[in-house]
């Protein structure tokens, strides 16, 4: 008896695309960190935009605006903590992603590797300018 996912026309398309996807044998869970980087970046951008709607950068009212976000904005404390912890998770995923590339020898593809290193430096410079200096 054959499986329905291999005989039904619609399920056969889904099966060939997701379940029985031909993939290399060294494709492991370490390869998910590139996708997690995209998710973390999207969360950072969204929470950053929503936090920027209520934040005031003036030195006399900056603390009060953060207190306003945490106390008066609906789920503002969740946005703030998601943004703070999302940055940490982003860098953890970034370092694991680079480490995976080092382990599997991706540095042999010099053009792709150099673009990735430039992106790494740009992310680190952005984090330094936006989070460390202020």
Swiss-Prot record:
Molecular function in Gene Ontology: metal ion binding; ubiquinol-cytochrome-c reductase activity
- Disulphide bridges in this chain? none
Q: Name one GO biological process term.
A: mitochondrial electron transport, ubiquinol to cytochrome c
Which cofactors are reported in the record for this sequence?
heme b
Q: Which residues form a coiled coil?
A: none
Q: Could you tell me which InterPro entries the record lists for this protein?
A: Cyt_b/b6_N, Cytb/b6-like_sf, Cytochrome_b_N_euk/bac, Di-haem_cyt_TM
Metal-binding found in the keyword field: yes
Q: How is the cofactor bound?
A: Binds 2 heme b groups non-covalently.
Where would you say this protein principally sits, based on its record? mitochondrion
State what this protein does.
Component of the ubiquinol-cytochrome c reductase complex (complex III or cytochrome b-c1 complex) that is part of the mitochondrial respiratory chain. The b-c1 complex mediates electron transfer from ubiquinol to cytochrome c. Contributes to the generation of a proton gradient across the mitochondrial membrane that is then used for ATP synthesis.
What family does the database annotate? Belongs to the cytochrome b family.
Note the subunit structure. Answer: The cytochrome bc1 complex contains 11 subunits: 3 respiratory subunits (MT-CYB, CYC1 and UQCRFS1), 2 core proteins (UQCRC1 and UQCRC2) and 6 low-molecular weight proteins (UQCRH/QCR6, UQCRB/QCR7, UQCRQ/QCR8, UQCR10/QCR9, UQCR11/QCR10 and a cleavage product of UQCRFS1). This cytochrome bc1 complex then forms a dimer.
Q: Please state what the protein is called.
A: Cytochrome b
Q: Which organism is it from?
A: Anoura caudifer (Hairy-legged long-tongued bat)
């Amino acid at each position: 008896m054959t499986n329905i996912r291999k005989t039904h026309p619609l399920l056969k398309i889904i099966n060939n695309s997701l379940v029985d996807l031909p993939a290399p044998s060294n494709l492991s869970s370490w390869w998910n960190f590139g996708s997690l980087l995209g998710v973390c970046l999207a969360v950072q951008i969204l929470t950053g935009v929503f936090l920027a709607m209520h934040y005031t950068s003036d030195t006399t009212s900056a603390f009060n605006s953060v207190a306003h976000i945490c106390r008066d904005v609906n789920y503002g404390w969740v946005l703030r903590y998601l943004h703070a912890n999302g940055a940490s998770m982003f860098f953890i995923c970034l370092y694991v992603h680079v480490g995976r590339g080092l382990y599997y020898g991706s540095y042999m593809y010099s053009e792709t590797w150099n673009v990735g290193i430039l992106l790494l430096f740009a992310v680190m410079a952005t984090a330094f300018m936006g989070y460390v200096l202020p």
